[in-house]
From Swiss-Prot:
UniProt name for this protein: Phenylalanine--tRNA ligase alpha subunit
GO MF annotations in UniProt: ATP binding; magnesium ion binding; phenylalanine-tRNA ligase activity; tRNA binding
Homology family: Belongs to the class-II aminoacyl-tRNA synthetase family. Phe-tRNA synthetase alpha subunit type 1 subfamily.
Species whose genome carries this gene: Acinetobacter baylyi (strain ATCC 33305 / BD413 / ADP1)
Top enzyme category: ligase
Cellular component, GO, one term: cytoplasm
Subunit structure: Tetramer of two alpha and two beta subunits.
Amino acid sequence: MRVTMSLEALTTEALAAIAAAQDLAALDQVRVLFTGKKSQLAEQSKALGKMDPEQRKVQGAAIHAVREAINAALTERQTALQQAALQQKLASETIDITLPGRGQHMGSIHPVTQVQERICQFFTKAGFSVATGPEVEDDYHNFEALNIPGHHPARAMHDTFYFDVNHLLRTHTSGVQIRTMETTQPPIRIVCPGRVYRCDSDQTHSPMFHQIEGLYVAENTSFAELKGLLINLLNEFFEKDLKVRFRPSYFPFTEPSAEVDIMDERGRWLEVLGCGMVHPNVLRAAGIDPEKYKGFAFGLGVERFAMLRYGINDLRMFYQNDVRFLRQFA
């Protein structure tokens, strides 16, 4: 009877210690004290072997009941302490949801690239292929093959970036047309977008700018076909029916040649591109018989089209990396 009473006292003492534990570390110490290998409960379990069977049965059941009560109290207290610790952590790491979020600014395609892709898409729908070539060009493909004589002003040092007497930064993408004609049999229908370089820098000119040139060579081409193609380009690009005029002009690589103007909202004529029928000397230089084939060509400045489309009066704004400006075209 004395042992049974000590179990009751042990239970009372253990439950009080469990309730008094303020954190998980203290609770673990209580667990070891009352249910560990050296605890009073373990000592009493060892004493069962010295009892007669009937007493062992009764006392064993009592010890088991005490152990279950202590373990249940330990589990309940552990859950409570873990929940309290979690609440304390949440309170210390709370997020002020009234603060504005730090949204990420999405990038976008540069307006010049947008315009270039828009123009190329028009021509690919019309059956043209996109062709590219080297930006460091030789004198032959940049000038001589295009019927540009040695005394032409474009060959001057103040207009062209030369590496040496035979190599330069291309001043137009026309060299791509020559290279294509040298390796491809007509019919040829290509557009050639890319960077070009000239010694010029002001409000409407840049040492580096983008150009798109086009070439169509076949047995039956005409200036009327060229005219219709370019008028359709201008109307689709600017999304309106424009007044367009073709002015007689001169380019060494086309004959006849013309410059194309559109009328703005103020009734002023604005030059937008140049064009013409490919000069027989250019066809001959590329190995194409000018008696059998004819062709037309055209060229335009991408930045020029972008400035007209978006109402920008200074080309240099495209290359100042001002995100406030560029974000308008996202």
